[in-house]
């Protein structure tokens, strides 16, 4: 039982916030591609795929960080740096979760299967970027957004649809914004051990850049709504998101670690709010 608990911690099954943040834009894409009537077996496949692939991403992330996590207060007790899970076990778990994700995508179509290989590559690449660039959050944004063209493809959507790629870019902006809040919690430790992040790159302008990224996200989501002819309820949900983003800024204004982490967590409500507005729009 202790080993299962360690695996759950390594895969973040016990902390599903990252899976939710990946799930919401995936569901946005399914609903947009299907004009509000997605095939329910695809909804199930993608929700399961989100949780399995995000868990695989967490495992490979901790494997990549195994040499430095022991020097960071927040991560020093994770299964790998503490020795509760071996490197071999971590790699086997990553492979198992990746295979599970691939089995799920086999229930879609060839085009989506081919797109999934790009998604796997992005998920495996992201954890190593923090050693080479101050923009690892950009690579996370690309990895978290790749489910969007996959969802469009599985639903039979047009991959040249501008709404698809606007949603892709909007989600990249949103991901960089909320993961910068997350990186702000580790900034003092990261500076000591040489790990790079947007929180370090943006420095004293971190909150200003986050606000700009959130503004770009909402602008693109508004444009998508106009192009799709969505109901006014969708735009109300975006106005609510403005309030949620302001609350995050106000909460993190003093850059307290716990406050920044709460601002990161609050983005689950943003994703949920946009989804509710989208679903409500298609019901009207």
UniProtKB/Swiss-Prot annotation:
GO cellular component terms, A-Z: plasma membrane
Subcellular location: Cell inner membrane
Pfam families: UbiA
CDD domains: PT_UbiA_COQ2
EC number annotated for this UniProt entry: 2.5.1.39
Catalyzed reaction equations: all-trans-octaprenyl diphosphate + 4-hydroxybenzoate = 4-hydroxy-3-(all-trans-octaprenyl)benzoate + diphosphate
Pathway, per record: Cofactor biosynthesis; ubiquinone biosynthesis
Keywords: Cell inner membrane, Cell membrane, Magnesium, Membrane, Transferase, Transmembrane, Transmembrane helix, Ubiquinone biosynthesis
Bilayer topology annotation: Multi-pass membrane protein
Alphabetized GO MF terms: 4-hydroxybenzoate polyprenyltransferase activity
Stretches that traverse the bilayer: 13-32, 90-110, 112-132, 134-154, 164-184, 200-220, 224-244
Single GO biological process annotation from the record: ubiquinone biosynthetic process
PANTHER family: 4-HYDROXYBENZOATE POLYPRENYLTRANSFERASE, MITOCHONDRIAL, PRENYLTRANSFERASES
Function text: Catalyzes the prenylation of para-hydroxybenzoate (PHB) with an all-trans polyprenyl group. Mediates the second step in the final reaction sequence of ubiquinone-8 (UQ-8) biosynthesis, which is the condensation of the polyisoprenoid side chain with PHB, generating the first membrane-bound Q intermediate 3-octaprenyl-4-hydroxybenzoate.
Record protein name field: 4-hydroxybenzoate octaprenyltransferase
Originating organism: Marinomonas sp. (strain MWYL1)
